[in-house]
Amino acid sequence: MYNMHHSHFNILLFVSIGNAERSDTRILLTSNATLREKHGEDYCAMYDICGARSDGKVVNCPFGSPSVKPDDLLSAKIQSLCPTISGNICCTEAQFDTLRAQVQQAIPFLVGCPACLRNFLNLFCELSCSPHQSQFINVTSISKLKNNSTVGSIDYYITDAFGESLFESCKEVKFGTMNSRAIEFVGAGAKNFREWFAFIGRKASPDLPGSPYAINFRSDADESIGMKPMNVTAYSCGDTSLGCSCGDCPSAPVCSSSAPQHFMKRILAQ
């Protein structure tokens, strides 16, 4: 059985923007350096892979660039996992393949509630591939890895509304025959979205599961420089199009205490 304190799955690593090894140099960006970065639609905050750590985790380049138009095959691949990403993208095929392989590890824990899983995937799809990545991603430190500059840490701006909806859709999802809550395994038992985000953003040491870079989740985006928090649609676990079982979503209207009574009255009246 997975230990929940060591189950910070590689799903949280997918963006491939790792820290350098401990002996490498980290450069903290000043506010002035940050302001020189371009933020806006169809612009990436980081693009392509610059190398790999000693533990094999690939790392992204920390340079902004225009989003790119994928070929039809890559576009279809991305749409199959990330339906919110259409048109241009901010990830290479190698980066997307890494994302897809690593998020697969979360699916067994969250698949019982499609709304939760969709919200969870959207969190990482937007971070990895959104063509508007620079609007809500800010590179805050650069690390040297084998003489290459790599992303060392980022700020990820997300609305509190999305964070709250994500957590609410997932907090009661059960995993396996043990009937344990999935959040114990993918969120170390977080009690709210801020605790979950803090867990997701924690930097892991080399060779341990977890994020190879620090992610600082924030909601206070500086709109004066073209930034705004990520806020894709988040689904309630009671959403009829992505319905979850009552065991995974006891708050759903169809799972309220009055629903079964009404159902039984109909049965008895027949």
Residue spans of the language-model regions?
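Cleavable N-terminal signal peptides of Sec/SRP-targeted secreted and luminal proteins
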Residues: 1-20
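Cleaved targeting-peptide boundary
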Residues: 21-25
